Amino acid sequence: MTQVTVKELAQVVDTPVERLLQQMREAGLSHTSAEQVVTDNEKQALLAHLKSSHGAKVDEPRKITLQRKTTTKLKVGGSKTISVEVRKKKTFVKRSAEEIEAEQRRELEEQRAAEEAARLKAEQEARERAEEEARRQAEAAKAQTAETAAPAAAESASSAEPAQVVAAVEAAAPAPERKKEEPRRVEKPRSDDDERRDRKHAQHRPSLKTKAPLARTVRSGEDEADGFRRGGRGGKSKLKKRNQHGFQSPTGPVVREVSIGETITVAELAQQMSVKAAEVIKFMFKMGSPVTINQVLDQETAQLVAEELGHKVKLVSDNALEEQLAELLKFEGESVARAPVVTVMGHVDHGKTSLLDYIRRAKVAVGEAGGITQHIGAYHVETERGMVTFLDTPGHAAFTAMRARGAKATDIVILVVAADDGVMPQTQEAVQHAKAAGVPIVVAVNKIDKPEANPDNIKNGLAALDVIPEEWGGDTPFIPVSAKVGTGVDELLEAVLLQAEILELKATPSAPGRGVVVESRLDKGRGPVATVLVQDGTLRQGDMVLCGVNFGRVRAMLDENGKPVKEAGPAIPVEILGLDGTPEAGDDLTVVADEKKAREVALFRQGKFREVKLARAHAGKLENIFETMGQDEKKTLNIVLKADVRGSLEALQGSLNGLGNDEVQVRVVGGGVGGITESDANLALASNAVLFGFNVRADAGARKIVEAEGLDMRYYNVIYDIIEDVKKALTGMLGSDVRENILGIAEVRDVFRSPKFGAIAGCMVTEGMVHRNRPIRVLRDDVVIFEGELESLRRFKDDVAEVRAGMECGIGVKSYNDVKVGDKIEVFEKVEVARSL
């Protein structure tokens, strides 16, 4: 065979020479140069090494299977034949040296066992011969004794008890032969066919395990008759036994204890009561609640169903995780005095932000859109008498929930009332929020520098709301102030700090941070940003925080001026970055130990929120069926709403959903915090909605879709404008009302006949003006008897378009000839009038 070098072999197998030399060295070959010759044996060694290194088996096959198939034909009857095919399969296994050695050992052991068996057999035969000889000798001696015995002895022997005879016979009887021990057979190597055949037979073979003895039952004749015999070829007849259960049915209803959480599905409730789900569904249908097997029930409904079905109910709280979290958050430490949190509330345009600007020496109100506050703002101010934290709330009617959150998170409420305006609706609402939160009120009577200011009117109005001034014997201080010139501001701060001293506000700075989310928004460059007011403990950068259904690690903290801070103590407002979403305003913020616990609680709250929402959605469906029966006929204005902060979004959704009447309604199909994105534009396109952006703008992708599809997208920065535009749109959807204006009345004085028009009424116009081709009514005794159209109007045989009051004319009524003297003809017109909400 032609000799091959390493280089040529590398070209054949398409691999680099260096790699081939490396593999040959790993295989134990001595090749180091590309020009060296490779023999066939070296190739085989290299191939075996490569196969073994890649997990392939290089051994020869150890098993060979031979199959044989023979076909024969059998004649049945005249010309009919049957083909018989016989298949045989044999498998030969090549045994290894270890198996051969084991077989030799088995043969040697078998030979030794055979020799031992032969020896034992010889000993057994000798023992049997000796026993037989002894038995013959005993029988001979017994016969001789019987011949010489007297007749009396025979009688006494006949009267012996049978038991003694049996005992004597048993004693004289030889021992039973012991079963010959056979040498144990040594199993030979088994082929695959034998093992497969044994497995097949083992499936039909009864189990050889020892079973516990069954309790015996006395079978009656009927039982014997009920059984039947089943015989088969080569098998014994077997008598079947009737199946009998081993339990008794309960004689009375079983009362079970049913554990019900805040929500439970119909299937879970049925399982706990040990009844079928169909019975629960049927029972709820009778109660008037059509449900399905997977429907979620609230706790009250499930309790009612379980009690009506006769079971005991155990109400279970699903807040195990929350309670565990509360236990972990308990902290004992030294409490110190903290700064008060003061919320400024009042009616819109009464000067809340201007008052805060004077205190902070800032100019926030100048830069606000529309001159009104639309966000809740948090600031802390260092005064000569100590630090005070202020929350500035919007005064517009739409921000009710925002003001309620401000009252919840505060210690003291400053109620700002304009001296020239008096007590307004939002002033009353602020008083209600403060009383509901149980916080003291300090009234700031603003705009005292105006000539039309009337402080006494303010006192009378607030006294009607149970806010009694100190001068009248109450406990509410009234401080006249002017945010413009600064009159009374120092007295106001002094009154606030005096209230704070009375409250004895304490906090534990060494504890983990705990607070409340004041506001949240989605920043394009920084992600979710939440404004947090720390109420207790210290919040530090790097802490893992939990806010409602959101969690995250605090990546950065900023104060109200946008400067980064490392930590925030009690009563300090900060903005935090790092949450996984924008939390709801008003959510509690807590610092937890690790991310695992935060994620677990957040997911639990998300699932709980979803379950409660589904249960509430289903609860009132049947009750409101008549109210919602005509909902399909309503015209709906769909809106996709995006706002800059969570509080504004909530306020806008509440205000817009409150607009409408029985014919038109507003539906916010999508809402969120942040800019208008491409997905928002697609949602508006799919739902035929209008895109509203409140203090946000659309990105390039969204603008492209809006331009291509011709969507209506509008930007706003004042809440008044968006509400007014939606009202106008709803007014346009209402359509128009048709009103009738009476133009004139003519009294019939005479009736003439005309071959062309039939009856012609000679009339005197008594009121207004009569026009031709206008709808008319014929009144007789002030009762309408005909309604039609004025076809002909003449004066002195001339066709005229109109006839004024005090003039005579002839009137021809189309398709009506029953005109009589004394009738009145009323001419009117129909006018469409725009409707309003």
Swiss-Prot record:
Domain spans labelled tr-type G: 337-504
Keywords: Cytoplasm, GTP-binding, Initiation factor, Nucleotide-binding, Protein biosynthesis
Biased composition, class Basic and acidic residues, residue ranges: 97-139, 176-197, 219-229
Protein name: Translation initiation factor IF-2
Region (G2): 371-375
The family this protein is said to belong to: Belongs to the TRAFAC class translation factor GTPase superfamily. Classic translation factor GTPase family. IF-2 subfamily.
GO cellular component: cytosol
Region of interest called G3, as start-end residue ranges on this chain: 392-395
Lineage: Bacteria, Pseudomonadati, Pseudomonadota, Gammaproteobacteria, Pseudomonadales
Region of interest (Disordered), residue spans: 97-253
